Amino acid sequence: MKPKSKVAESTAASCFLVMSLLCSCIIGDQMETNNEGLSYSYYEKTCPKVEEIVRSSLSSMFILDPTSPAALLRLMFHDCQVQGCDASILLEPIRDQQFTELDSAKNFGIRKRDLVGSIKTSLELECPKQVSCSDVIILAARDAVALTGGPLISVPLGRKDSLSTPSKHVADSELPPSTADVDTTLSLFANKGMTIEESVAIMGAHTIGVTHCNNVLSRFDNANATSENMDPRFQTFLRVACPEFSPTSQAAEATFVPNDQTSVIFDTAYYDDAIAGRGNLRIDSEIGADPRTRPFVEAFAADQDRFFNAFSSAFVKLSSYKVLTGNEGVIRSVCDKVD
C-alpha cells in the first residue's frame, strides 16, 4: 500500500460513485420505531423530499472532492460520541465560551461542517424550520457510506439540536485517543449498546479516508507497540511516509497515509489489512489479532454482505445515541448558531 495522489483518488471516486448508486442496497427496518422517540417516517408529511435533497447536494460534491465522504462520516462519529447526536459539533462558541469541543486535539482535522450548513440552507428553502441539523449530519454520513459503495442504511429520524456546545474538557474525556486498544474500543461501543460483532463492524468506517501522521507517530512512542499485530514491512512504510518529526508538529499534522489500499471505496479491504497487520492505528492492527475480535474480522473480510448488515445495525445504534427529541432540543435555522 502506498499514498494515493488526489488525481488518482478523484478518478477512482468519479467512476465508482455512479456505480455505487445503482448497487447500494437499503438495509434497516422500514417500520415505525419508538427508539428514543425517532421514526423512519418522521418527515413524511413535513418535509418528504429531505433525503432526496441531502443526497443530491452530496453527489456532485463527492465527485469534486473524494475525501468528503470520510470527512462527513468522521463528523457524525465525533458529534455522536460527545454527549450524543445533537449537532453540537457545528456550533460556534456561544457568548463568552472560550474552549469548545472543536478545540479538543482529538477533533483535529474535522471538516465539512460548512457542507452540512449548505445542505441545511437548501432544506430551509424547501421546508423551513422542519429538519434539524443533527438529522442532516446523520443523513449526510449515511449517504457518504452509500455513495462510496457501502450499504444505503435506513435510519430513523426526528433528532433535535442542542442549545449549547460541550467544553473542550468534555470532548477530551469522551472521544477515544488515537492509541486506543481493543479493550478501550469494545467498552466504548458497548456503552452504546453494540455487540462485539457490531463494534468490529463500526470500525470498518476506517475503510475510507486517511490517517494523519501525528496519530500514526504516537504508536511508535507507545511502550506497548511491540505487542501490536504489526507487519514489520508495513511499519517501515509508515516510518518512511511519516518521518520522525514530533507528533505535535505542523508537518505531522499536514502529512497523512490512506486508511487502506482502496481508501475512497467502502469495502472490506480494511479487514484484509487488519488480518495482515497493516493497520495505521493501534486498534486497526490489534483488532485482527485479539481472540475476541479476530473471528469477526475474518468473517467480514470473507463476506461483504455480513459486514454491511452488521455495520448498518451499528450505525443505527450510534446515530440514535443520547438523541434529543420532542421538547428536549430545538431545530436551528442555521446550524452554527442557536436561534
UniProtKB/Swiss-Prot annotation:
Per the entry, the cofactor note is: Binds 1 heme b (iron(II)-protoporphyrin IX) group per subunit.
Residue stretches spanning the membrane: none
Required cofactor names: heme b; Ca(2+)
Q: Where is this site: Transition state stabilizer?
A: 74
Residues in the active site? 78
Keywords for this entry?
Answer: Calcium, Disulfide bond, Glycoprotein, Heme, Hydrogen peroxide, Iron, Metal-binding, Oxidoreductase, Peroxidase, Secreted, Signal
Query: So what EC number does this one have?
Result: 1.11.1.7
Residues the record lists as binding Ca(2+) 1: 79, 82, 84, 86, 88
Q: Name the reaction it catalyses.
A: 2 a phenolic donor + H2O2 = 2 a phenolic radical donor + 2 H2O
Q: Could you say which residues bind Ca(2+) 2 here?
A: 207, 260, 262, 267
GO molecular function annotations of the record: heme binding; lactoperoxidase activity; metal ion binding
> Which amino acid positions bind substrate, per UniProt?
176
Among SUPFAM superfamilies, the record links this protein to: Heme-dependent peroxidases (SSF48113)
User: Which cysteine pairs are joined by S-S bonds?
Assistant: 47-127, 80-85, 133-335, 213-242
One GO term under biological process is:
response to oxidative stress
Gene3D superfamilies referenced in this protein's UniProt entry, alphabetically:
1.10.520.10, Peroxidase, domain 2
GO cellular component terms, A-Z = extracellular region
Q: Which residues carry a glycan?
A: 224
Q: Where in the cell is it found?
A: Secreted
Which residues make up the binding site for heme b? 206
Q: What class of enzyme is it?
A: oxidoreductase
More about this protein: There are 73 peroxidase genes in A.thaliana.
User: What family does the database annotate?
Assistant: Belongs to the peroxidase family. Classical plant (class III) peroxidase subfamily.
Q: What does this protein do?
A: Removal of H(2)O(2), oxidation of toxic reductants, biosynthesis and degradation of lignin, suberization, auxin catabolism, response to environmental stresses such as wounding, pathogen attack and oxidative stress. These functions might be dependent on each isozyme/isoform in each plant tissue.
The entry's protein name is Peroxidase 29
